[in-house]
């Protein structure tokens, strides 16, 4: 039991530490790019408080999928029943939810940016970053399925690698005057893509 709990605790610690690092690193690097301190903090607030919550909208559905699917996957693993077909159905459903949410973000981006948040600069962020919605949804579900198969240690190693990559890219890119906040977005997107790719590889290697 402890061997399962420790990696999960580690992942929560990594997530918390990453938020702390981002809250200090991104504004500091944006200032180096030439933005005043107040503007750098405002841009970071737009990223963390406006963009990210919208991109994570499907999480209330994907969390439910994880809660239902993970125990069934564990049961099939214990019984020696093939799991790959179940994994395909779950990921297919998740992808459909993510794609629908992506289209929704694209269509309603002007309403979200101009009416809800009253931030015109948020519109291009939403439009360009909406492709991350299905990636983030899939990452969340794949992580839940891996936990159901007892792959918490693998999930932790992937999270550590992806977060380290994200920090390094943010440090390098967010300070570029031609990128600024887009540098942080690129770093975040790269980390999400790497997380999904490595997690899918580990998941399919574990199921049959």
Name the predicted role of every residue range.
Residues 4, 8-11, 44-51, 85-98:
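Junctions where cytoplasmic loops transition into the N-terminal start of transmembrane alpha-helices
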Residues 13-57, 113-115:
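Helix-terminus/linker motif at the lipid-water interface of multi-pass membrane proteins
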Residues 23, 189-208:
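C-terminal transmembrane helix end/exit motif
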Residues 150-153, 163-197:
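Membrane-interface helix-loop junctions in multi-pass transport and translocation proteins
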């Amino acid at each position: 039991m402890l061997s399962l709990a420790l990696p999960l605790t580690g992942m929560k610690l990594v997530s918390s530490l990453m938020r702390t690092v981002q809250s200090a690193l991104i504004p500091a690097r944006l200032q180096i790019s030439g933005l005043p301190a107040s503007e750098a903090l405002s841009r970071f607030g737009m990223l963390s408080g406006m963009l990210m919550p919208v991109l994570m909208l499907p999480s209330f559905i994907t969390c439910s999928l994880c809660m239902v699917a993970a125990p069934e996957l564990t049961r099939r693993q214990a019984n020696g029943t093939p799991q790959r077909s179940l994994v395909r159905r779950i990921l297919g459903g998740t992808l459909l939810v993510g794609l629908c949410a992506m289209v929704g973000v694209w269509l309603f981006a002007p309403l979200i940016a101009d009416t809800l948040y009253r931030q015109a600069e948020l519109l291009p962020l939403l439009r360009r970053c909406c492709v991350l919605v299905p990636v983030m949804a899939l990452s969340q579900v794949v992580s839940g399925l891996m936990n159901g198969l007892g792959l918490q240690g693998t999930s932790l190693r992937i999270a550590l690698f992806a977060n380290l990559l994200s920090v390094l890219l943010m440090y390098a890119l967010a300070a570029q005057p031609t990128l600024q906040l887009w540098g942080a977005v690129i770093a975040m997107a790269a980390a999400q893509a790497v997380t999904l790719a490595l997690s899918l590889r580990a998941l399919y290697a574990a199921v049959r």
